[in-house]
Each structure stands twice: as C-alpha cells, then as structure tokens.
Amino acid sequence: MECEACIGMGKDCNSWMKTCAAHEDTCVTFQTEVIAAPVSLTVIFKACGVSDTCHLDYMETTLHDKVKVRIKRSCCTGEDCPLPPFPGLGFQVNRPNRLHCPACIGLFSKECTEHLVSCRASENQCLTVTGKEFGLFFRALSYKGCATESLCALLKKRFWDGLEDIEVDFKCTPALPPPSLASDV
C-alpha cells in the first residue's frame, strides 16, 4: 500500500508517495492547530497509519489557559485510497470543565517548572510526555498538561514508531478535581 506523505505549515504540504510498512493499512492526515492566543499556527501531516486508531479522530491538550493544541485526523483505508480527505478543524468554544493538571513545557530539557492549568471541554486526563530523541527538532523535550482520552489512547498505540529518530515516553493519569478551599475553622 502507498500513501501520500509530508509535513508542512498551513492546510497543505508538498507530498510524495510512500510505501507503507506491512502493519500499516490506512492513509492518515493530521491537521494540528497550535493556539497561543491571539495567534494560531496550523500544521498538516500526512502518513501511513493503522486503521484501528481511525476512531480517534479528535484530540486536544492544554498547556496554559491561553495555549492549547487541537488535532483532527482523517483516515482512508484500502488500496484505492492513498489520499485521505482533509480533516477540517472547525471553530470550537472550549470552556473550562473544573478539572486541573500540572502543566509545563521544556523544549530542550527533560524537566520543566510546573504550574496548575484548567482543563477544557472533554479534557479529563493529565498528560506527561518526555522526549529523549525527537528527530531533527529536539534532543530533549518535556511536556505536561490536560489531554483528551482520545489523545492518550492514540499515544498508547505509539503511532510514531515508524518514524525515525523519535524516542518518546508518555503517561496519562486522571485529571484532578478543583482544588478545595481551605477553611479557617
């Protein structure tokens, strides 16, 4: 099976046809939006994938009250479908859901200084990611924040195993309830 493969800024990228590994049975397009209010950046990623993750089509993670990442995926399974449809992230209002997680990012470090962040919409997991190797981008990476169960499920499938030079560990735990107010009684 062959799929379109590329990564680029915006809603399209200069692709080539890639022969998929034996266990890969679907073509996948990821549209990722990184929002650091008031700015947003869209990245498109096309690759081979596995069809048992296609139901995980929408994911979110929040790093800060004004910084979040939204991911929408589309799959196309079968020999006659090398070009999956564009996922199309729509506008969405994501209100806080009263859950919290520790959050931080370290772009060149396996450690970072945590702060508490409010989870939004369907984010009910606390995500911790540690990258020991991250391709051409980073030699170390740490990330903590709120996440959707779908993002945790996709990470559990280790979808990046086919990518070279990426070594990432992650952990998801249930998000924390609102901090209780201490009383002076």
Curated annotation (Swiss-Prot):
It is found in: Secreted. It comes from the Eukaryota. Expressed by the liver. One of its GO terms (cellular component) is extracellular region. Keywords: Disulfide bond, Phospholipase A2 inhibitor, Secreted. Disulfide bonds join C3-C27, C6-C13, C20-C48, C54-C75, C76-C81, C101-C126, C119-C146, C152-C172. The keyword Nuclease does not apply. InterPro entries: CNF-like_PLA2_Inhibitor (IPR050918), LY6_UPA_recep-like (IPR016054), PLipase_A2-inh_b-type (IPR016338), PLipase_A2_inh_N (IPR004126), Snake_toxin-like_sf (IPR045860). One of its GO terms (molecular function) is phospholipase A2 inhibitor activity. CDD domains: TFP_LU_ECD_PINLYP_rpt2, TFP_LU_ECD_PLIGB. PANTHER family: LY6/PLAUR DOMAIN-CONTAINING PROTEIN 8 (PTHR20914), LY6_PLAUR DOMAIN CONTAINING 9 (PTHR20914:SF30). Heterodimer with phospholipase A2 inhibitor 31 kDa. Inhibits the enzymatic activity of phospholipase A2. Belongs to the CNF-like-inhibitor family. This is Phospholipase A2 inhibitor 25 kDa subunit. It comes from Naja kaouthia (Monocled cobra).
